[in-house]
Curated annotation (Swiss-Prot):
Catalytic reaction list: 5-phospho-beta-D-ribosylamine + glycine + ATP = N(1)-(5-phospho-beta-D-ribosyl)glycinamide + ADP + phosphate + H(+)
Organism ancestry: Archaea, Methanobacteriati, Methanobacteriota, Methanomada group, Methanococci
Gene, per the UniProt record: purD
GO biological process: 'de novo' IMP biosynthetic process; purine nucleobase biosynthetic process
Signal peptide, first to last residue: none
Record's protein name: Phosphoribosylamine--glycine ligase
Pathway entry: Purine metabolism; IMP biosynthesis via de novo pathway; N(1)-(5-phospho-D-ribosyl)glycinamide from 5-phospho-alpha-D-ribose 1-diphosphate: step 2/2
Main enzyme class: ligase
Residues that coordinate or bind Mn(2+) 1: Q282, E294
E.C. numbers: 6.3.4.13
Top-level taxonomic group: Archaea
InterPro entries registered for this protein in UniProt: ATP-grasp (IPR011761), ATP_grasp_subdomain_1 (IPR013815), PreATP-grasp_dom_sf (IPR016185), PRibGlycinamid_synth_ATP-grasp (IPR020561), PRibGlycinamide_synth (IPR000115), PRibGlycinamide_synth_C-dom (IPR020560), PRibGlycinamide_synth_C_sf (IPR037123), PRibGlycinamide_synth_CS (IPR020559)
Length: 444
């Protein structure tokens, strides 16, 4: 069974490991940099930009895969699935039109409005800077609501800024909106939304167009520094619990979050003819219940590493059920284990990361800790590893309790050396307790 994998980060490393648990799988990977972990698992690799559709086509023609799995969002936004399907290759991932659920935040908000999906919020999209945009930000403030400023398109998870966090006040928010128009960031359109108060969590679903099968809930940590301080990143690490929900969630929260995603899948069927692949909802748990911050059209990174580490099924079976519309016929099951994932990143990340610096990873020592290792934004050159500026290496602890899973992941970070740092507080009970207290406070 030949599988074409597109992408070369830690998320794709987790996908590669999950696929290779099936001995029939032969992996062929197209990625931008040489990820040593993925390269080892692959029969053949091609180094090219994941958005270079000509390179994808050429590699697919050569390999003739039975199935393709798409890791990152950028190629989905370029229409890589449309291309592969035209070539007669089934792909786990949405077509360009359906991928807009991530690649076009205005499309996502309008979908919620049109189909009256629960968990929506106040928003307005703008094509140019002007009085209307300024007034909307001021109107939110008058209602006691802070503004969130987002480019409408893709920015690699780093374009969102919030008043009271990255933006000091409304004047800075307006200035940032202006900057988005001037630089063309994320397509140069701006979405202004209300800031939600609460605790963030994520939920993934495997979708075949009709059926959605859910994974455990995961909590990501987007802030760069301990205690949830610093710049917003692509995610510094994440954890999941043995009971598959999060400690600050009620059964009602679980039910509502799943209903929102089910309604979204139905709406996408009506609007664009269906969605297949992985759907990843990023939620804010507010005192009114879960609300959607945004959707992603693929696995979360880091969350894929938590989820695929405890998936009981043969992942190939799940992928085949997605493309063959057979998800209703299988049970997707996960072990009742806790997982903690921690990223080791270059110093200065995300604002001013060191690039091209060497990093050393003692794989044997990490293996002895019991942790799972995934290489991310590194490039292997002549046997040495160099950081390329984004998150470098991830380690995952899996155990019966969060405390033990956290200890395993933390122990493993000691064997990664270089101009690097990580958040040691992810998965620690003090930080989780803070989240529980925040939710209790809001619910009072």
């Amino acid at each position: 069974m030949k599988i074409l994998l597109i992408g070369g980060g830690a998320r794709e490393s987790a996908i590669a490991h999950a696929l290779k648990k099936n001995e029939e799988v032969k992996l062929y990977t197209l990625m931008k940099n040489k990820n040593p972990g993925i390269a080892r698992l692959s029969e053949e690799i091609k180094l090219a930009k994941e958005t270079d559709l000509d390179a994808v086509k050429e590699f697919a023609e050569k390999v003739k895969p039975d199935l393709a799995v798409i890791g990152p969002e950028a190629p989905l936004g370029e229409g890589v699935v449309d291309l592969l399907e035209e070539m007669g290759i089934s792909a786990v991932g949405p077509k360009k039109l359906a991928a807009q659920i991530e690649t076009n935040k205005e499309f996502m908000r309008n979908l919620f409005k049109k189909y009256n999906i629960k968990g929506s919020l106040m928003y307005k999209a703008f094509e140019e800077y002007g009085e209307e945009l300024e007034s909307f930000i001021d109107e939110l403030t008058e209602k006691g609501i802070k503004a969130v400023v987002k480019p409408v398109g893709l920015t690699g998870g780093k374009g969102v800024k919030v008043v009271g966090e990255q933006l000091k006040d409304n004047e800075e928010a307006k200035k940032y909106a202006k900057e988005i128009f001037e630089t063309g960031l994320g397509g140069g359109k701006v979405l202004i939304e209300e800031k939600l108060e609460g605790v963030e969590f994520t939920l993934h679903g495997f979708v075949d167009g009709d059926t959605i099968k859910f994974t455990p809930f995961v909590q990501d940590h987007p802030h760069a520094l301990e205690g949830d301080e610093g710049s917003i990143t692509g995610g510094m690490g994440s954890y999941s619990c043995p009971d598959h929900k999060l400690p600050f969630m009620t059964e009602e929260d679980v039910k509502l979050a799943k209903e929102i995603m089910e309604e979204t899948v139905k709406a996408l069927k009506e609007e664009v003819g269906g969605y297949k692949g992985i759907l990843y909802g990023q939620f804010m748990l507010t005192k009114e219940g879960p609300k959607i911050i945004e959707y992603n059209a693929r696995f979360g990174d880091p969350e894929a590493m938590n989820l695929l580490a405890i998936l009981k099924n043969d992942f190939l079976e799940v992928c085949e059920a997605i493309v063959n519309k057979k998800l209703k016929d299988i049970d997707v099951e996960f072990e009742n284990k806790a997982t903690v994932c921690k990223y080791v990143v270059p110093k200065g990340y995300p604002d001013n990361p060191v690039r091209g610096e060497p990093i050393t990873v003692d794989e044997e020592a990490i293996k002895k800790t019991g942790a799972i290792l995934h290489y991310a934004s590194v490039n292997e050159d002549n046997g040495s590893l160099y950081m390329t500026g984004s998150r470098a290496v991830a380690v995952v602890g899996v155990a019966d309790t969060i405390e033990e899973a956290e200890r395993i992941a933390e122990e493993a970070t000691k064997y990664i050396k270089g101009e690097v740092y990580h958040r040691s507080d992810i998965g620690k009970k003090e930080l989780i307790k803070k989240r529980i207290e925040k939710m209790n406070e809001l619910r009072r």
